[in-house]
């Protein structure tokens, strides 16, 4: 695996065989000392190359997941890696602040619990200009101009 990429560690927890925890668990904020379970949701999207490596404002990376039988979710950690083209066997690391959507409301959501129904989504906007270096900004994922893929890992605690 490339430097900076987190390797998922599959772990059996009874009936939740698809539960994934991250090896770097120590880097997560302790928002809930006794979580029901934590799931890391990998999500990859290809960056469409447009004119001068631009994508429309409002383009969204999103991860939708089922949350049946849970009343709240806490986003514990959000991380992203951008894979450069040509490949250099390395991912550039970015920490993002997510937008958490429940119903019609959208709010900044990290390290706090929120009541949810049966579906939740975490989204990320990317700006128009992709020529700059990879930086982290509020609710925005900026990628380098030679980036072709973005991988997101969202670690959530469901209660």
From Swiss-Prot:
SUPFAM superfamilies: Satellite viruses
One Gene Ontology molecular-function label: structural molecule activity
Compartment annotation: Virion
Coiled coil, from the record: none
Keywords: Capsid protein, Virion
Domain of life: Viruses
GO CC annotations, alphabetized: viral capsid
Gene3D superfamilies: Satellite virus coat domain (2.60.120.220)
Primary localization class, coarse: virion
Further information: This virus depends on tobacco mosaic virus for its replication.
Protein name stated in the entry: Coat protein
Source lineage: Viruses, Riboviria, Virtovirus, Tobacco virtovirus 1
């Amino acid at each position: 695996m490339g430097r900076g990429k987190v390797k998922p560690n599959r772990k059996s927890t009874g009936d939740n065989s698809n539960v994934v925890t991250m090896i770097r668990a120590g880097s997560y904020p302790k928002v809930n000392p006794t979580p029901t379970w934590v799931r890391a949701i990998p999500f990859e999207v290809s960056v469409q190359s447009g004119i001068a490596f631009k994508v429309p404002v409002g383009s969204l990376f999103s991860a939708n997941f089922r949350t049946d039988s849970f009343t709240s979710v806490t986003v514990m950690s959000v991380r992203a890696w951008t894979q450069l083209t040509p490949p250099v066997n390395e991912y550039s690391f970015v920490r993002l602040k997510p937008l958490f959507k429940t119903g019609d409301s959208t709010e900044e959501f990290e390290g706090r619990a929120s009541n949810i129904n049966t579906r939740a989504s975490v989204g990320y906007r990317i700006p128009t200009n992709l020529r700059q270096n990879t930086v982290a900004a509020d609710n925005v994922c900026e990628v380098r101009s030679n980036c072709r893929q973005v991988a997101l890992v969202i670690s959530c605690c469901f209660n």
